[in-house]
A protein has these predicted regions:
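Active-site neighborhoods of divalent-metal-dependent phosphate/nucleic-acid chemistry enzymes
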Residues: 68-114, 141-155
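Alpha-helix/helix-capping structural signal
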Residues: 8-9, 38-41, 76, 117
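Generic structural signal for small/hydrophobic residues in well-ordered secondary structure
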Residues: 6-8, 21, 43, 81, ...
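Amphipathic alpha-helical segments within well-ordered protein domains
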Residues: 44, 62-65, 82
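Short, well-structured N-terminal submotif of metal-dependent ribonuclease cores
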Residues: 1-35, 47-63, 133-139, 144-146, ...
Length: 155
């Protein structure tokens, strides 16, 4: 199975917290996890907006992209975006999230995110959460024991 990692999951990998995200990533074969160029753009923007630890953050992002390929956004992804935008036009949704969702659907892979609510009701999108307790738990209180893996859910 292949996975597209959302921005929050990439940040968890860079920070190494929560540990269950890294544990899950380690079970995959090389190339099974990818990120959208949209996620890469969000990570770059975050890096550009902050000044503390700039060199360290540059190295961390370079290391991440050396291990997790960045997929270009192509015509098929743009077509999926148009369909999703039309299907959910009355809902106020983040454009970057719509682009990431469309990208995952266009290549037929599961989107891994800790923001399941942000991706609810996207046509054809399959979502999986590798860090279900991360949003509700402070980093210092994250359990060392990884939770049971949730099966993918089609949303």
């Amino acid at each position: 199975m292949r996975y597209m990692l959302d921005t929050n999951i990439c940040i968890y990998i860079i920070k190494g917290n929560p540990p269950q995200v890294l544990d899950r990533l380690k079970t995959l074969t090389q190339g099974s996890a990818v990120m959208s160029v949209v996620t890469y753009a969000e990570l770059r923007a975050g890096l550009e907006l902050q000044s503390a630890n700039r060199a360290q953050d540059e190295r961390a992002l370079a290391f991440l992209t050396s291990r997790i390929p960045v997929l270009p956004f192509n015509e098929s992804a743009a077509q999926c975006f148009g369909v999703m935008r039309a299907a959910l036009r009355e809902r106020n949704r983040n454009t970057m999230d719509r682009l990431i969702a469309a990208h995952a659907v266009s290549v037929g892979i599961t989107l891994v995110t800790n923001n399941e609510a942000d991706f609810k009701d996207y046509p054809g999108l399959v979502v999986e959460n590798w860090a279900p307790s991360a949003a509700a738990t402070a980093p210092s209180k994250v359990s060392k024991k990884a939770p049971a893996r949730k099966p993918p859910t089609k949303v």
